Amino acid sequence: MAEFNIDELLKNVLENPSTEISEETLKQLYQRTNPYKQFKNDSRVAFCSFTNLREQYIRRLIMTSFIGYVFKALQEWMPSYSKPTHTTKTLLSELITLVDTLKQETNDVPSESVVNTILSIADSCKTQTQKSKEAKTTIDSFLREHFVFDPNLHAQSAYTCADTNVDTCASTCADTNIDSCTDTNEDTCASTCADTNIDSCTDTNEDTCASTCASTCTSTEYADLADPERIPLHIMQKTLNVPNELQADIDAITQTPQGYRAAAHILQNIELHQSIKHMLENPRAFKPILFNTKITRYLSQHIPPQDTFYKWNYYIEDNYEELRAATESIYPEKPDLEFAFIIYDVVDSSNQQKVDEFYYKYKDQIFSEVSSIQLGNWTLLGSFKANRERYNYFNQNNEIIKRILDRHEEDLKIGKEILRNTIYHKKAKNIQETGPDAPGLSIYNSTFHTDSGIKGLLSFKELKNLEKASGNIKKAREYDFIDDCEEKIKQLLSKENLTSDEERELIKTKKQLNNALEMLNVPDDTIRVDMWVNNNNKLEKEILYTKAEL
């Protein structure tokens, strides 16, 4: 077979576009232009597991950028119906000052028309400002409901707490708010600032938290001990005071944008550079300060609830075909071109010379990146050199990849629980508004809705108790607990001989059942108070009810 010359083929096609190309020539052209070139056919099979963590990261990165964008856009947005004719922010106060000045400097009061014009402009500015404020408040409320974690509204924060740094972080990061962050102790301040929005934190509290943190944090607290590359969220959210011993170096590095970007790049790659020797000697102290800009603080202050991630994913899954059709119409990419694997060879990983020889032998013939796969270990799909370096790093610090995989598994588990709780509350509201389901509805659903995506999320007992409680979730939960107690008592009584532990369990369960039955009579807006009264040397329980503060 003659050697294939692509330049000659291209020249012939340009000179005579109608020239026919043989199938053999097309096949050779395809082999030359195909980046996934095959070297040999091997009957051996490599078994591996693969999970696309990159895709999950991209989704979170998109979510972070989207949240930052919508909140920033809200700040700059002006409703179309309230765009002011006068755009000066201080115009209202300036007009009032102008009227006072005219009265003081002239003996005559300004003409009525001048005063009316000025007051009309001032009133217009005030009205437009008020309308804009009301519109922004409404939109801000909507955005916070969907994109800012609130323990009273959402099941779980999307933030993964780095509990290896702060002792109290694990217990408080999921249910605290920085608005109440007045404690000057660094451990408490750091843990209460982790999972929340800090827009409304007062200047006094912010300054106190920041100054206290800067004075008490050591360099080890600037980084996640399990993942040194990660800046803890409680550090990112604060305005850090630069320690005196770092001030001169920080000023020199941040004097120009080029200097800042160079320093940030070196910190990211941990490369040695003589001109910033001090920074490289203590990178953990410099890194959070350099990256602690207004933008990073702004982005880290809006932590979305885990509910939003799940709802977004559920929306994609539920509308996948429609989204795919729309995407194919808008963009040129094809959905069926995903991942393709080819195994070139298997060599002894302990013989680094053979590994390098293979790479350098074929690097000019392989247009795509080469990844080395270590058998029996998770493999990161990156370029040959970077993959090997990151592989060694992550296997030496396997807590990092373990945290990623654990979070991936946790996200899959919590999705079903979020959906179940949503359905439970909506069903309770439906029963309150329209009453229980018609008797034949369950038969209809079982016959015609056999492929329902939510089938089985609520048990028959939960639905029955919701109807029994007329949609009152508190009472329905109590009915569930009563059913569980009665079932446990029934199981224990069915046994012929009970052990001492089982007898104690039976007595305990009966007490819990009696207490639960009493709680059914407690109104929703009251709190039951048990009081013990001495009646002829005998203690008797009396029950009082006090008004609950809603």
UniProtKB/Swiss-Prot annotation:
GO terms for cellular component: host cell cytoplasm. Its main location: host cell. It comes from African swine fever virus (isolate Warthog/Namibia/Wart80/1980) (ASFV). The keyword Repeat applies. Plays an essential role in the assembly of the icosahedral capsid of the virus. Allows the assembly of 3 molecules of hexon protein p72 and formation of a thermostable trimer. Belongs to the asfivirus B602L family. Induction: Expressed in the late phase of the viral replicative cycle. Keywords: Host cytoplasm, Late protein, Repeat. This is Protein B602L. Residues 161-220 are annotated as: 15 X 4 AA tandem repeats of [CNG]-[AEITV]-[DNS]-[MST]. Sequence repeats lie at residues 161-164, 165-168, 169-172, 173-176, 177-180, 181-184, 185-188, 189-192, 193-196, 197-200, 201-204, 205-208, 209-212, 213-216, 217-220. It comes from the Viruses. It is found in: Host cytoplasm.
